[in-house]
């Protein structure tokens, strides 16, 4: 959600900023802008729309060796040129970009900016104007910046230019991700490592309530008291080629195809020298010894948690609750005496989940983060971390992170079961390998998935997904995939709930997708399909081999039914992809959505 890039060095700042912002497009945005500094001053270019639109307005003749850039996802003020970043102070001395939400911007405006006319509706402009007011009152830029930061309530990642000191970028962070990349004759600032890989893979992580003074040959980190902080740098595990589409038309299709490889990598990563599945002993003990586990997630991660709940309860015999992070913060349930909290987040930066983590840590409870990004905020602040090893996921619609979360939760449940002396009844390593092969076979049947999308979703405005047991949890994920990238109103329902209200929405031609992978509910879900078909629905049954009937539209390869969610979701991902494609939608960057939701 939003992105920041900054550069100061010897190269063309404009192009580095624009390329960096392109690497942050996956985070979601509605406008973009850059500010570059040279001997003539600070030049600001911004535009509503895509980075391609911004490129059209950037003056190619302006040469600069330093700059800051931003992609905006509207929180305060509509998407517009005036609300796009960078923002400048009234006298034009300061230029600033900001990610996050300043909760007390109205109070700051009333207290410090009574005589300043604001040009935008944003909370961000208030920050840059307050800085200038403090400088006008006699403070040096660094001190004015620090004083302003101490006043801010909320989340922020900020990069600031001073027109009187154009060889320096002032940076600060609180509850919004920001990294500083290191080079021999340059330094860069970015919301995540993907934006800086074009020039460096070495970076320093910033902690909350820290500020940084960045020049082309120096990075000085300070706390808000002005004390200098020394911190070791990291080498990013990513390679620039990891974040390219290659021959694929869209990242979503590429990432769907990568799922079998991710499954095999998870198997390999979580095997010990004897080929047995393993996680660090303290994590296994935390799961096995908990009297109740609370899985916290948002969107797709929440859906993965629903599947993980079944594994942990069925195999490890530990009760589990799954909660939407944004609701948990305000409606915390009565907690057990020895809980363990598991946080699912692809990015490790989800603000709603982090808010819950802060709450439960304050209560003294243990927390495990399962994430795709090492060193992310949720990873750093939890007691334990398990990594998904899925590689960068760029498309807004999650595919491989979802199946990776399910696989890692399965591994965790299996290890906890073993620690509790429970035999789960099958070889999970072998069955995950079979599931990976099945996923690969499904990825090779794209023509069939495209045909189903054309047949059922070409003119549809609504669609329903029904299932029972584990299939129901996959249905809610399939519905989310369809609605978020094709803009078709789609909902997933438990098959038995149809008669309690939802069936009233069924009319002639309504597409209804049904999953049938669980033997104990196979007859029941087929009965539900007959109910909606009798009312005119256009039904599509996707069944598991061995449970299939002659009239089923598509049959999945045979896998262990417990792991069917890893396999049954792949057709739903591809059907959603082709439905969006045929409707002319932006598959990788759907409207109004952000990949990494870093504000509550």
From Swiss-Prot:
One of its GO terms (biological process) is carbohydrate metabolic process. Gene3D superfamilies: Glucose-6-phosphate isomerase like protein, domain 1 (3.40.50.10490), Glutamine Phosphoribosylpyrophosphate, subunit 1, domain 1 (3.60.20.10). The keyword Cytoplasm applies. SUPFAM superfamilies: N-terminal nucleophile aminohydrolases (Ntn hydrolases) (SSF56235), SIS domain (SSF53697). GO terms for molecular function: carbohydrate derivative binding; glutamine-fructose-6-phosphate transaminase (isomerizing) activity. Residues 283-422, 452-590 form the SIS domain. Keywords: Aminotransferase, Cytoplasm, Glutamine amidotransferase, Repeat, Transferase. One of its GO terms (cellular component) is cytosol. Its EC number is 2.6.1.16. It catalyses: D-fructose 6-phosphate + L-glutamine = D-glucosamine 6-phosphate + L-glutamate. Its main location: cytoplasm. Residues 2-217 form the Glutamine amidotransferase type-2 domain. The active site is at 2 (nucleophile), 595 (for fru-6p isomerization activity). Pfam families: GATase_6 (PF13522), SIS (PF01380). Induction: Constitutively expressed, part of the cdaA-cdaR-glmM-glmS operon. Homodimer. Catalyzes the first step in hexosamine metabolism, converting fructose-6P into glucosamine-6P using glutamine as a nitrogen source. PANTHER family: GLUCOSAMINE--FRUCTOSE-6-PHOSPHATE AMINOTRANSFERASE, ISOMERIZING, GLUTAMINE--FRUCTOSE-6-PHOSPHATE TRANSAMINASE (ISOMERIZING). HAMAP family: GlmS (MF_00164). This is Glutamine--fructose-6-phosphate aminotransferase [isomerizing]. It comes from Bacillus subtilis (strain 168). The gene is glmS.
């Amino acid at each position: 959600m939003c992105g920041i890039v900054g550069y100061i060095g010897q190269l063309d700042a404009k192009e580095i900023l624009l390329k960096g912002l392109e690497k942050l497009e996956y985070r979601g945005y509605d406008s973009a802008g850059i500010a570059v500094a040279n001997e003539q001053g600070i030049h600001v270019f911004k535009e509503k729309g895509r980075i391609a639109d911004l490129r059209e307005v950037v003056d190619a003749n302006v040469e600069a060796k330093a700059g800051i850039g931003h992609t905006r996802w509207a929180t305060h003020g509509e998407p517009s040129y005036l609300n796009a970043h960078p923002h400048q102070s009234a006298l034009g001395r300061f230029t600033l970009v900001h990610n996050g939400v300043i909760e007390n911007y109205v109070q700051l405006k009333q207290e410090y900016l009574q005589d300043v006319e604001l040009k935008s509706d944003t909370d961000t402009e208030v920050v840059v104007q307050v800085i200038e007011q403090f400088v006008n009152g006699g403070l040096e830029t660094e001190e004015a910046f620090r004083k302003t930061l101490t006043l801010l309530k909320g989340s922020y990642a900020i990069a600031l230019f001073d027109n009187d000191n154009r060889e320096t970028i002032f940076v600060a962070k609180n509850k919004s991700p920001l990294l500083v990349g290191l080079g021999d004759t340059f330094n860069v600032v970015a919301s995540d490592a993907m934006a800086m890989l074009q020039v460096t893979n070495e970076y320093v992580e910033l902690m909350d309530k820290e500020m940084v003074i960045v020049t082309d040959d120096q990075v000085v980190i300070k706390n808000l008291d002005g004390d200098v902080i020394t911190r070791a740098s990291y080498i990013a595990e990513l390679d620039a080629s990891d974040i390219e589409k290659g021959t694929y038309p869209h990242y979503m299709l590429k990432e769907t195809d990568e799922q079998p490889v991710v499954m095999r990598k998870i198997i390999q990563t979580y095997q010990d020298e004897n080929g047995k599945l393993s996680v660090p002993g303290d994590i296994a003990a935390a799961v096995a010894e908990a009297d109740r586990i609370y899985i916290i997630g948002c969107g797709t991660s929440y859906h993965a948690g629903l599947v993980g709940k079944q594994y942990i309860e069925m195999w490890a015999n530990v009760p589990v609750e799954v909660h939407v992070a944004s609701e948990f913060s305000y409606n915390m349930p009565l907690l057990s005496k020895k809980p363990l909290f598991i946080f699912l987040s692809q990015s490790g930066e989800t603000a709603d989940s982090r808010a819950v983590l802060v709450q439960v840590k304050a209560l003294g409870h243990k927390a495990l983060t399962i994430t795709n990004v090492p060193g992310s905020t949720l990873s750093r602040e939890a007691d334990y971390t398990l990594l998904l090893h899925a590689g960068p996921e760029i498309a807004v619609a999650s595919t491989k992170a979802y199946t990776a979360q399910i696989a890692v939760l399965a591994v965790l449940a299996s290890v906890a079961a073993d620690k509790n002396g429970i035999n789960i009844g099958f070889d999970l390593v072998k069955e995950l390998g079979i599931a990976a092969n099945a996923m690969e076979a499904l990825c090779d049947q794209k023509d069939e998935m495209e045909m189903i999308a054309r047949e059922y979703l070409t003119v549809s405005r609504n669609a329903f997904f029904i299932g029972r047991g584990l299939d129901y949890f996959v249905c809610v994920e399939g519905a989310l995939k369809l609605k978020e990238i094709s803009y078709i109103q789609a909902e997933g329902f438990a098959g038995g709930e149809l008669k309690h209200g939802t069936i009233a929405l069924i009319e002639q031609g309504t597409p209804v997708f049904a999953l049938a992978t669980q033997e104990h509910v196979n007859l029941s879900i087929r009965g539900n399909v007959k109910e909606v078909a009798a009312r005119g629905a256009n039904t599509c049954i996707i069944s598991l081999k061995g449970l299939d009937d002659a009239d089923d539209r598509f049959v999945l390869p045979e896998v262990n039914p417990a792991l069917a969610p890893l396999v049954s979701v792949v057709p739903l991902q591809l059907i959603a992809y082709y439905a969006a494609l045929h409707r002319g939608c932006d598959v990788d960057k759907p409207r109004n959505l952000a990949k990494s939701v870093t504000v509550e």
